[in-house]
Amino acid sequence: MVPPTEVEKVRAFIRANIGKTLFSTGAKIVYFKGSLYNITGSTHDPQQVRDYEGENWKSLLVRKAELDDARCYVTNLSAPKGSNHDNFAVGGHMTTNPDGEVEKGGISYLMPLCKWHNSTARNGEAFEHTETKMLRLTGFMEGETPTTFMARMPSEKSHVLLYLDPLSGRWESSHLDAEQAIAPEAKLFSDAIKITQPSEYAVLENRGDGFFIKAAKLA
């Protein structure tokens, strides 16, 4: 079975949450010493990305926590010869719960991992680490992509436009004020993203207690 692409994951996330309140999100630097476990159901970094805001979990970790030169944090579970340990390949979603489960919208952690330790084959394994600087995430939802998580990060503007860019073929986001969000579609897109109307999009509104998908057009 072919795994879903990043475009398909974002589309599925939007479709599954139309009419529902989504959590606001946050990412805060913390220094955590305890054992951590891979989260079951978290999404890995896309294979091919451009390094800019919202594109992958690793770029969020590097930008927010300034971990450009980090290596994979895990010290107790030896990777086999020939693996990519100790490369910092992905931002790994972690929890203190041995079963790998996180309550919807609950707290999770993001730390540097190699792909070998980030594999689902390591689910349930306690990871020890001497490096402690990482991000504590709030509002993360199971199966969420970096695109939708980053779209709900704090902003002075009240709305977010998620759209499938016809040039790059990727989901991207742009923050909107209230006037832009209620404008006719043609003006909304030209003002917010300077391109003609994309084939797929969603408009999210921050209502204080979370975000609400107020409009969407999907394939």
Name each model feature, range by range.
Residues E128, P154-A219:
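C-terminal, well-folded lobe of enzymatic/effector domains
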Residues M1-Y52, S78:
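A boundary/linker detector
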Residues P4, N17-K20, P46, G54, ...:
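Long, charged interaction segments in nuclear RNA/chromatin-associated proteins
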Residues G41-K64, G92-G100:
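Short Cys/His-rich Zn2+-coordinating modules
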